[in-house]
């Protein structure tokens, strides 16, 4: 969203200036493909996708830091880049396994913040694993061991597969032109090790219980700041002027802030997109993807956001955002009514500003209570807590 807002109240200026882009994907999975198996000793650890670069270092930690608080070098190395072509190749290789008569993938995990360290350790958290540093794909030869292990080059998937099925996966990966690397073994010793066979260098060797079982809880302390806002002054004779001003807000009368660029019909399953009519104005309240080319079933998505309301009252902002999303999605015929709906809660918040952690707690609490009252689940979400901006 390029929607910005500022408000002067007493000696404080409140508002939001940062440009936000929220992107997400929708889809469905078969129930028999949803449950992971437990890796067994001597199973192979495999990576599908691209090479390692100095990308996404610091991951979640940097994304939640104040903009301008860290050096430009750290922030630059934390930036994520994308390679959709590589993502598609890796996804097609996984899809090839899923659509086979029997899916031989034991367990699979994406590469998020923390890179190989996060992905591969979670694959073997019940068993243990040994990763050969020499087998990890390197796109930048200047990477240190820390950068090689922890970067967030995103177009990659980590998976575990039995050694006897490696050839099947390799054939599918070759067909889809997806790079594939066998980088380690499941050990069964409940340790997670990165080691170079050529040099003997071992930058990491941990007990799994030290990684997963004893993480200290983070305690955040903040104080509640009460802000009293003056009542809005208005003149009933200027209703036409007020109406025109409100309708000029992009978040009110136009869905332009979602996006109205590029072709969103690739694949032929887009039943309803943002743009509508001969002028392709982005006015639709809901987007709909068909599940296939012949049935009348699909997946509907909508969005709700209420940043101005949340500035005044975080609880009201949470409830308003959910309400907006629901009033947008009612134009799709939901098979099971509200029971058909799942929410993704996305928090864009200036944490570490005095009083903002307390406001965020209130907002999350309100989401939870409101969703429970409605009988709607919130299985996922995303936080971006670096919305605090330092101006020179």
Predicted regions and their residues:
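Glycine/proline-enriched, intrinsically flexible loops and inter-domain linkers
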Residues: 1-392
């Amino acid at each position: 969203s390029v929607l910005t807002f500022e408000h002067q109240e007493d000696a404080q200026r409140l508002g939001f200036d940062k440009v936000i882009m929220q992107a997400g994907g929708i889809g469905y999975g078969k129930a028999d493909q949803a449950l992971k198996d437990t890796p067994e000793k001597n199973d192979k650890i495999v990576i599908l996708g691209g090479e390692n670069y100095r990308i996404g270092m610091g991951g979640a930690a940097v994304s939640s830091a104040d903009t301008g608080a860290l050096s430009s070098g750290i922030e630059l190395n934390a930036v994520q880049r994308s390679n959709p072509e590589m993502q598609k190749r890796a996804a097609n290789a996984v899809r090839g396994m899923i659509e086979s008569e029997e899916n031989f993938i034991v367990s699979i995990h994406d590469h998020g913040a923390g890179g190989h360290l996060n992905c591969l350790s979670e694959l073997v958290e019940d068993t243990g694993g040994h990763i050969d540093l020499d087998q990890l794909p390197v796109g930048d030869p200047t990477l240190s061991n820390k950068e090689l292990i922890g970067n967030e080059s995103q177009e990659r998937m980590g998976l575990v597969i039995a050694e006897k099925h490696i050839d099947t996966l390799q054939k599918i990966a070759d067909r889809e032109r997806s790079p594939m690397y066998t980088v380690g073994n499941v050990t069964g010793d409940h340790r997670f090790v990165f080691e170079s066979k050529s040099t003997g260098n071992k930058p990491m060797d941990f007990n799994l219980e030290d990684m997963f079982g004893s993480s200290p809880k983070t305690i955040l302390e903040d104080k509640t700041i009460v802000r009293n806002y003056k009542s809005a002054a208005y003149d009933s004779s200027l209703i036409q002027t007020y109406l025109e001003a409100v309708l000029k807000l992009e978040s009110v009368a136009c869905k332009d802030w979602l996006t109205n660029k590029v072709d969103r019909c690739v694949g032929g399953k887009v039943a309803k997109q943002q743009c509508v009519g001969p002028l392709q104005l982005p006015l639709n309240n809901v987007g709909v993807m068909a599940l296939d080319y012949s049935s009348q079933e699909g997946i509907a998505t909508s969005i709700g956001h209420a940043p101005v309301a949340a500035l005044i009252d975080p609880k009201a902002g949470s409830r308003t955002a959910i309400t907006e999303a629901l009033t947008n999605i009612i134009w799709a015929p939901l098979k099971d009514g509200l029971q058909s709906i799942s929410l993704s809660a996305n928090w864009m918040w200036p944490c570490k500003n005095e009083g903002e952690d307390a406001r965020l707690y209130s907002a999350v609490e309100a989401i939870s209570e409101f969703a429970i009252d409605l009988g709607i689940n919130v299985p996922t979400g995303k936080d971006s807590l670096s919305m605090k901006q330092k101006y020179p």
